[in-house]
Each structure stands twice: as C-alpha cells, then as structure tokens.
Curated annotation (Swiss-Prot):
InterPro entries: Ribosomal_bL33, Ribosomal_bL33_sf, Ribosomal_zn-bd. One of its GO terms (molecular function) is structural constituent of ribosome. Belongs to the bacterial ribosomal protein bL33 family. One of its GO terms (biological process) is translation. The keyword Repeat does not apply. Keywords: Ribonucleoprotein, Ribosomal protein. The keyword Ribonucleoprotein applies. This is Large ribosomal subunit protein bL33. The gene is rpmG. SUPFAM superfamilies: Zn-binding ribosomal proteins. GO terms for cellular component: cytosolic large ribosomal subunit.
Length: 55
C-alpha cells in the first residue's frame, strides 16, 4: 500500500484565544510550516494562524 502523503494539521491562532482550525497538507509539496491569515471568531478579526501538530 502507498504511504499517506497528506498529514492532518491544526492551525492555531496567534492571538492566544485558543481557537484553531483543522486541515490537511501535503508533506512533500510543503515541508515547512504553514502561516495563513484566517478569521478568529473569538476576537472577531482576521489574524495570523500558525501550523501546529494534532495530538
């Protein structure tokens, strides 16, 4: 069987609110950490989200 190429990741808010999104990423195409600007409903603003591991 083929090895999994996509890995589940958690996008954690840099505002420190504890809010996160879950998504997948291709390990081969994007080996470095993701940084995306997404909406944080806790503070009701768009904020930078950093990649973290799912436990």
């Amino acid at each position: 069987m083929a090895k999994k190429s996509r890995e589940k990741i958690k996008m954690i808010s840099s505002a420190g609110t504890g809010h996160y999104y879950t998504t997948t990423k291709n390990k081969r195409n994007t080996p470095d950490k993701l940084k995306l600007k997404k909406y944080d409903p806790v503070i009701r603003k768009h904020i930078l989200y950093n990649e973290g591991k799912i436990k």
